[in-house]
Amino acid sequence: MGYLSCNGESAVAICDTYNWNPRRRSKVPEKRHPPKLRVFNYDELAVATNGFSANNFLGKGSHGRVYKAVLDDGKLLAAVKRTTITTTVGNNNNNVSQVDNEIEILSRVRHRWMVNLIGYCVDHRRKTKLLVVEYMPNGTLHDQLHSRSSLDSRLSSWNRRIKHALQIAIAVHALHTAETQVIHRDIKSCNVLIDGDGNARLADFGLALIGNVDDERLKYTPPAGTLGYLDPSYLAPADLTAKSDVFSFGILLLEIISGREAIDLNYSPSCIVDWAVPLIKRGDYDAICDLKIKNRPYYAVIRKLAVMAARCVRSTAKKRPDMLEVVECLKTVRQLSPAWNKLRRRSEERSENVLAVEEEKEEIHVRIVRGGSRKNRKVSNVTTSVDDVYERLVPEETLPFRRRNFVLRSRSVGAKVGPDPYDGFGDETVVTMRLLIEKERPVTTAAMRLSKSRSVGIVRSHKTASRKRY
């Protein structure tokens, strides 16, 4: 019966209200209610779009023309998709128009990195259906990537490209992990819109399918998508899985990295997969990086991203990663990019006066006189006064033999001084010193008092003279 016994200590531990955290209580998951959609009338949307005028025309979507609309007395900017009602063929209830399909999906799913549905309008008299969605003022990702206009240089930043890729990956992952799975089937740069805050939003759900793979509706829906982004293993309705979206996203990722279109007849090979994957396999990651990117990332960052893109476009669907793995990879890459940039800025600031002036270096010969007393020893052919010299000790890249060279820095002259190979031989030695003439902002360092070395006679500090040489 010892299992049922309890003592005072255990009783106090159980009843200790001081250490009890109310946040640890198991919370009942809240039900996610579908977003409330507004039902507009046709006349209201006609006024908001100036009669669907050409001045309000934004573009053409997968199932209609898109217009800019000003609603609620100018308080709400929206985009209106106008499409014609089509009659279904036969009595097959599974045949749903793209606009009805988009209304069904967007009425169930809502995400901050998606172009969400505000409302809709059905006008049977005019045989027209209209979708009212969020307005994206900065166009498509395709326009920003491939526009030749000098004004469209907004994606010259590597960090911004990675941010857009991560936002779309999160949106696709949210679709795949929704309460009822959604497969987009048409992920491409034209369906990625940029909002007013510079964020990427996934749009156009006309071809998307909602439901389990075993649903009858999905089994009889023929393959669809855009050439260049379409999964090559998706040949029949039964082949559809979430990995088809992964393939399309891999094409989009290669497009973001390289700046090339999915299909470009101006290049050979014209398909971005046939061009990029062999380069990635050879390890030539810089060759696929867009030249328009100003702050090009380091090798390790490009490699990680390029390998993930190559995995996404594998011909076998089962070998592709899921979107959760893609999201985690992009998060890591986005964290690495600022870290590398910060290290690069520090490295550039540190080596600004040492490495950036290598083209303006000069070699002079310094004659060192060893004869006589220490007072008579002197260094000739050096114009810098000892009183004006300040030192900075900068270790170079570690060598395999534990021997290091040191760079002596001054406000006016920098000299690279290494071990003297002729030390101890003869009374006079000619030592070659490489002087680096500074032209940039000097490095701020603490001043140190210098003295002459007993063995060579070159100006050195106590810190340098006392350092062990291996």
UniProtKB/Swiss-Prot annotation:
Location of Phosphotyrosine modifications: 234
Modification type Phosphothreonine: residues: 221, 226
Chain positions recorded as ATP binding sites: 58-66, 81
Keywords, alphabetical: ATP-binding, Kinase, Nucleotide-binding, Phosphoprotein, Receptor, Serine/threonine-protein kinase, Transferase
Pfam families for this protein: Pkinase (PF00069)
EC number: 2.7.11.1
Domain Protein kinase: 52-333
Enzyme active site: 186 (proton acceptor)
InterPro entries named among the record's database cross-references: Kinase-like_dom_sf (IPR011009), Prot_kinase_dom (IPR000719), Protein_kinase_ATP_BS (IPR017441), Ser/Thr_kinase_AS (IPR008271)
Taxonomic superkingdom: Eukaryota
Enzyme class: transferase
Cytoplasm listed as a keyword: no
UniProt keyword Nucleotide-binding, yes or no: yes
GO terms of molecular function: ATP binding; protein serine kinase activity; protein serine/threonine kinase activity
Record's catalysed reaction(s): L-seryl-[protein] + ATP = O-phospho-L-seryl-[protein] + ADP + H(+); L-threonyl-[protein] + ATP = O-phospho-L-threonyl-[protein] + ADP + H(+)
Family stated for the protein in its record: Belongs to the protein kinase superfamily. Ser/Thr protein kinase family.
Identification of the protein by name: Serine/threonine-protein kinase-like protein At1g28390
Annotated organism of origin: Arabidopsis thaliana (Mouse-ear cress)
Lineage, opening ranks: Eukaryota, Viridiplantae, Streptophyta, Embryophyta, Tracheophyta
